[in-house]
């Protein structure tokens, strides 16, 4: 399923953007229209370097607002977790207010986003919030799929193989054989010949057996 099919299913199969319908349409993008330098040089630049209508708060979140055509008023679109979500919200409002003359942050916003038929501020705010949330959900699914693949590969690599089992047993065997060298070192420190390792030695034997053992 391609991106157009996915979003057509999300917004309804009969949905058709008022901008993309009716002939060829090549939207004007923010990347092709560089922003003018900010006039306030004494203050920190809060505008996003590329996205239109997007500013960063001190908290790290992003806000979006758009000026209404031929008016001094602005429509507040909300506060968002990422700049991309705010940029999507901007595109909804820009298309609703300016149509094909809108400068968009994303080229696919012309056909991906559901644009309200009314230019009422509340309708635009609702559609902008919906577009931002849909974009967030899409990014979450992509991230989840990527992490799921990584986790699957990690689990496959972490399987306990028979070779690893044999290596673990071999280490235990070495530890057991190391007991003889330990006894050799102890005997050397006492200037005595090293005794043989008798794991089933009976401590109740007679003293003569001890003498015959050390005589060899």
UniProtKB/Swiss-Prot annotation:
Keywords: Activator, DNA-binding, Nucleus, Stress response, Transcription, Transcription regulation. InterPro entries: AP2/ERF_dom (IPR001471), AP2/ERF_dom_sf (IPR036955), DNA-bd_dom_sf (IPR016177), DRE1A-I (IPR045277). Residues 50-107 bind DNA. The keyword Transcription regulation applies. It is found in: Nucleus. It comes from the Eukaryota. GO terms for biological process: cold acclimation; response to cold. Transcriptional activator that binds specifically to the DNA sequence 5'-[AG]CCGAC-3'. Binding to the C-repeat/DRE element mediates cold-inducible transcription. CBF/DREB1 factors play a key role in freezing tolerance and cold acclimation. One of its GO terms (molecular function) is transcription cis-regulatory region binding. Belongs to the AP2/ERF transcription factor family. ERF subfamily. Expressed in leaves and roots. This is Dehydration-responsive element-binding protein 1C. Its main location: nucleus. Disulfide bonds: none annotated. One of its GO terms (cellular component) is nucleus. Residues 15-42 are annotated as: Disordered. Changing residue 49 to T: In strain: cv. Cvi-1. A motif (Nuclear localization signal) lies at residues 35-47. Induction: By cold stress. The gene is DREB1C. SUPFAM superfamilies: DNA-binding domain.
């Amino acid at each position: 399923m391609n991106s157009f099919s996915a979003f057509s299913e999300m917004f309804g199969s009969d949905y058709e953007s008022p901008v993309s319908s009716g002939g060829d349409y090549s939207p004007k993008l923010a990347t092709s229209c560089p922003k003018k330098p900010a006039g306030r040089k004494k203050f920190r630049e809060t505008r996003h370097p590329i996205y239109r209508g997007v500013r960063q708060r001190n908290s790290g979140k992003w806000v979006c607002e758009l000026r209404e055509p031929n008016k001094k008023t602005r429509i507040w679109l909300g506060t968002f977790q990422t700049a991309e979500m705010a940029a999507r919200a901007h595109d909804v409002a820009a298309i609703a207010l300016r149509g094909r003359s809108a400068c968009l942050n994303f080229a696919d916003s012309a056909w991906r986003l559901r644009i309200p038929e009314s230019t009422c501020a509340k309708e635009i705010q609702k559609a902008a919030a919906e577009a931002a949330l849909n974009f967030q959900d899409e990014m979450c699914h992509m991230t989840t799929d990527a992490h799921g693949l990584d986790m699957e590969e990690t689990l496959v690599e972490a399987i306990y193989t028979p070779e690893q089992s044999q290596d673990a047993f071999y280490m235990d065997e070495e530890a057991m054989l190391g007991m003889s060298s330990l006894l050799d070192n102890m005997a050397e420190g006492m200037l005595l010949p090293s005794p043989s390792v008798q794991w089933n030695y009976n401590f109740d034997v007679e003293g003569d057996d001890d003498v015959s053992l050390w005589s060899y």
